[in-house]
Regions:
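Phosphate/nucleotide-binding beta-alpha loop and adjacent structural elements of enzyme active sites
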Residues: 2-289
Length: 289
């Protein structure tokens, strides 16, 4: 009746609706941009930003961001040795020892005041006999380096006074590599390596090259975020360093989203990733959720 087949007509209608939708989106974008200084649009933006941040699981809330859940889901694996680099006051180490009853933890904390608080936190703990404290840092090369402690924010210890407006206390830190440490201790394999060192995670991994190339580390957790801008070691670089041997995924409260690298994930939002040896599909299944 109208000079076209039913399928062709449906296609034309669909294309028309799509074009209309695109024009509508363009109009809405323009309206938002023109009124971006208004109170209503500002409130909507803050609400949307909060939603997006939550959707990306941004933040370091150990109890709720999925880090504790990772430990719990790995309980059946009966892990025996974990390395906690950047232990702070021991939240992760305590969680690992509680979830893995046969595991020992080596906890590294380079800041002297934080190291004291870490040791004190375990003095009367029932898991005290399974944790060993090390007042030194791990990096890509051994030696001494000036680092900075922030008394009001002890989790921010790093090798540069990057946080403007915060009091920074310089101190001399002794560093070694994970390869050297394990060689000295006769440690042949690591079940779980957790790294949270304010943007220097890649240095720790480079100092473990021997262990990595020998497939001696089953799982790795590292933090990624805005400090990658300063270090210029991007999420892309972590995938290039690790993806030959590991499957890599972002940690969420109820699952790990394993997958390949995509430039849209290079968002510099503070979050945690976990890597599992490709030859350990059992651990991968536990974590997928």
């Amino acid at each position: 009746m109208f000079g076209c087949s039913r399928g062709a007509c449906r296609g034309a209608v669909g294309r028309g609706l799509q074009m209309g939708w695109e024009r509508s989106k363009s109009a809405v974008r323009g309206a938002i941009a023109r009124h971006r200084r208004s109170a209503i649009v500002g409130t909507m933006h803050r609400a949307a930003a909060f939603f997006v941040s939550a959707w990306h699981n941004e933040g370091g809330d150990f109890a709720n961001n999925g880090e504790r859940a990772v430990l719990q889901r790995l309980t059946p694996a009966d892990l025996r040795l974990a390395i906690d680099v950047g232990a702070n006051v021991g939240d992760w180490a305590r969680g690992a020892l509680q979830c893995w009853p046969n595991c020992r933890v080596h906890a590294f904390e380079v800041a002297p005041r934080t190291q004291e608080a870490l040791v004190a936190a375990f003095l009367s703990s029932p898991v005290r006999g399974r944790i060993e404290f090390h007042a030194l840092g791990l990096s890509d090369l051994p030696g001494d380096r000036t680092m900075y402690y922030f008394p009001d924010h002890d989790k921010l210890t790093c090798d540069t006074p990057r946080h403007e407006g915060l009091a920074a206390v310089p101190f001399e830190a002794h560093l070694t590599t994970l390869d050297a440490f394990c060689g000295e201790r006769g440690i042949e394999a690591i079940d779980f390596l957790k790294i949270d060192v304010e943007g220097a995670e890649h240095r720790v991994l480079k100092g473990a090259r021997g262990l990595l190339e020998a497939d001696r580390i089953a799982c790795i957790q590292f933090e990624y975020g805005a400090f990658s801008i300063q270090t210029r070691f991007l999420l892309k670089d972590y995938f290039e360093l690790l993806s030959e041997r590991f499957v890599i995924g972002k940690i969420f409260p109820d699952h790990v989203a394993f997958g390949g690298y995509d430039w849209t994930t290079e968002d510099f939002r503070f979050s945690n990733y976990v890597c599992v040896l490709k030859e350990r599909p059992d651990l991968q299944r536990m974590l997928r959720g």
